[in-house]
């Protein structure tokens, strides 16, 4: 695998679960500056372990966001933070090819799970969830594609501009960011991923249970998927 840095977990649960009113206040005051900058680490050149597929496929507290057929021979689970630049890179480069070549042809089932590293990532994940099933992945794609526009010191206005394209009004935007149940569900899944599957950086992928930390190129993904498609 090509060596690339990845965003590492540097924040504690008490900072992630900051409360719904406080979340909006933090974003209004400057959502990025509130956090320590993430450390960087080299991506690994191969699988770094393996987890139980039975455990991995237990849905997240809010339910999983899935693309592809349930009987696909390969299941890929990605844990990503919406503010992670290497997650954005994967979704702008490898993901479109993966979806066209493997997901849309019934070879891969793709499960995307949120692993927010900061309040801004948490807010973007909440907005994608609030958008609904049909608009979830398009809004995820939009946030990744325009990451440089909204991962800024004053993020609320550019975030709303993106969310507005998915049908949000100012009222529904504010209501979403004040949804404590959704916030708690995302935080609970982040905690489960960390404790159960040793996810401590983003992006982290599980390909049929094998763990890969760091972004994957299309060629690297082809290499890892190929053995499961033989015969």
Model region roles, listed by residue range:
Residues 80-83, 88-164:
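Structural alpha/beta surface segment adjacent to cysteine/selenocysteine redox centers
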Residues 76, 84, 173:
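Residue-level signature of catalytic and energy-coupling elements of molecular machines
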Residues 57-74:
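A short beta-strand-turn-helix
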Residues 2-46, 164-231:
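C-terminal cap of thioredoxin/glutaredoxin-like
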Residues 46-58:
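N-terminal low-complexity, Pro/Thr/Ser-rich intrinsically disordered segments
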Residues 78-81, 199:
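Processing junctions and N-termini across compartments
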Residues 70, 103-105, 198-200:
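Extracellular/periplasmic catalytic domains that process cell-envelope and extracellular macromolecules
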């Amino acid at each position: 695998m090509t060596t690339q840095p990845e965003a590492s977990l540097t924040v504690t649960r008490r900072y992630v679960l900051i409360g719904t009113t406080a979340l909006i206040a933090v974003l209004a005051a400057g959502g990025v500056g509130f956090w320590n900058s993430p450390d960087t680490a080299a991506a690994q050149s191969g699988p770094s372990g393996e987890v139980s597929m039975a455990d991995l496929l237990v849905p997240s507290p809010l339910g999983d966001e899935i693309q592809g057929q349930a009987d696909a021979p390969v299941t890929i689970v990605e844990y990503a933070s919406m503010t992670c630049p290497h997650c954005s890179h994967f979704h702008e480069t490898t993901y479109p090819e993966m979806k066209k070549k493997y997901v849309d042809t019934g070879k891969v089932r793709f499960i995307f799970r949120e692993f927010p590293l900061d309040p801004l990532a948490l807010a973007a994940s909440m907005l994608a969830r609030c958008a609904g099933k049909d608009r979830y992945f398009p809004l995820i794609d939009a946030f990744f594609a325009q990451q440089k526009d909204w991962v800024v010191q004053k993020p609320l206005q550019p975030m709303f501009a993106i969310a507005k394209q998915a049908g949000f009004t100012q009222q529904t935007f504010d209501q979403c960011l004040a949804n404590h149940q959704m916030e708690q569900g995302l935080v609970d899944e982040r905690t489960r991923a960390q404790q159960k599957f040793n996810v401590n950086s983003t992006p982290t992928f599980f390909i049929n249970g094998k763990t890969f930390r760091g972004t994957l190129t299309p060629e690297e993904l082809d290499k890892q998927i190929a053995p499961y498609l033989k015969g």
